[in-house]
Amino acid sequence: MFNKLIKILVALVIFYQTPVYSKSASFNDFNSRDLTNYFSGIIAYENKDNTDALKFFNASKVLTNKHDIYLKRYVYSLVLENKVAQAINVIKNRNNKDNTDFFNAYILLVVDSLKKNDFKKAEEYLTQSLKFKNQRRFNLIISETLKQYVYSFKNKKILSNKQNFGNLSLISQMFQRCYLKKSNTGSFFVNLINNQQGDYSRYIFFYINYLIENKKIEKAKEIAGQLEYINSTLLLSQSRSWIENGKFKEFNKIFSCNNHNDIVSEFLFLVSNLYSSQDDFENSNFYLNLSNYLNPNFTFNLSLVAENFYMNKEYTKVKEVLKNFNKEDEFYYWFRVKKEAQMIIKEDGYEDGIDYLSTKFNKIKNPNLKMVFDIANFYKNAKKYEEAIDYYTQIISSLSDKSDMKSDLLYRRGGSYERMGNYEKSDEDLLHSLRINPDDAYALNYLAYSWLERDYKIDEAFQMLEKAYAAKSEDPYIIDSIGWAYYLIDNYVEAEKYLKRAVELMPEDPIVNDHYGDILWKLNRKIQARYFWNNVLSFDDTDEDIRKNINIKIIEGLKNS
């Protein structure tokens, strides 16, 4: 409460010192209620409670013509609440046009112009937006890329003198060629999808869409047939399902290269993903809502909104977004069920979450392997290893020995056996996994760690750990393992170097903190050791068995030390 009061006082000082809205110039234009609502809105806005922020901003709309900061926040809040059309109207209907001079305002006006097929206006607004190109990291990319798109839409050709933004520009060129019906469009799709500099698998959907739109059905079937349900994204799994069931028209219902709004919508979705990857979920949702405004038919993109809200623990909003996914599109419906189960786990615990998921799963007549895989992972995370093993076994028996997915499933099942103490079965699965994929750092790490804990094949375990570390030297779990290996052979100085790094990378991991405490104790740094053991007790996800052991160590120290 005190912090909120400080924020209000600071905001008041700024507010009265703003030339556009000074006390002497315009204090009589509003009343104390406007001020109260405005500053309440600021507090809600700063606390990322956008729904409340918008409620307070709506109650003080008299300020939209008088205070630049207010207008920016009000417009931003409107878009976050998916009221894009209202946000556009607020900007367009301002008496004072000077206070609409900010980046998001121009992007909204561009979106409005595209919606109305007014490419000339869109170009004018994009030119204006460039004055803010250095204000935020992605502003230049957004303005320049939109400029290239609008040029193609307006002039029916590709802009020759343009800025290059690497692979982002390759994506833009691909869609521009698709829109202009260039003969080499297919080659651009193939080159992008096979690009080794990143994961561009999403664009397989758009390639299939392009093939269907151009009546190349057999080629579309061939591409879809190469997709594996179990390791494909939701969008690609749904695409393969549509192809297998002859639902070719579904593709054009949600996207068409002939529609400029659909193309720009996809670009804005890409921007949203960029922000989401940096944990900037508000800006991600801002651009995602603009994307949805231009192409409301691509409801599958709302899965990113649901993920963003989930990461912010806004579960009520997640539930609302999930209502967009129904049983007709089975993979997105399954995404909905999983996300609902995850929220139940967060709110009520694993037992209730697993019960909900298994009940929904059992009602599915012919569950896909991807669904079986997901429920197996849920059971494994819930420490219900027997159930997890049963589901993993169902999938493993259906896969070829050459399949990389079989290697991964054997690794997961082997880990489940290890947790149950069935080391013979665990070793069998993990070794089988490594025969398929000898360079899998995680399988190497898991098996080596298990052997070290059992004081079994120490030299071979060390060799496996060194191989895993060479492949994944920045992975904190592998760093922890190799550090713990040195601990187990009494090389505490070397062990400390690795565990210190692991703690720096995973400061809230109970096992890593526990290990580091043990090593510090052996190095006679006992005060520091107890500090890290106490850390373990402060973590919400620390197992009860670990807590009991830590409490003993804090009192008695390490035995035999």
Regions found by a protein language model. Give the residues of each.
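Alpha-helical adaptor scaffolds
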Residues: 79, 179, 338, 342-345, ...
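Generic helix N-cap/helix-start motif at coil->alpha-helix transitions
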Residues: 29-37, 64-71, 98-108, 121, ...
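Terminal, low-structured helical/coil segments at or just beyond the last alpha-helical repeat
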Residues: 255-257, 261-265, 510, 515, ...
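Alpha-helical repeat scaffolds
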Residues: 54, 58, 84-97, 119-133, ...
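Structural motif corresponding to the intra-repeat A-B loop/turn of tetratricopeptide repeats
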Residues: 47, 81, 116, 154, ...
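Sec-dependent signal peptide recognition
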Residues: 3-11
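N-terminal leader/linker segments that initiate helical-solenoid repeat arrays
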Residues: 17-74, 80, 88-89, 100-101, ...
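Residue-level recognition of tetratricopeptide repeat
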Residues: 42, 76, 111, 149, ...
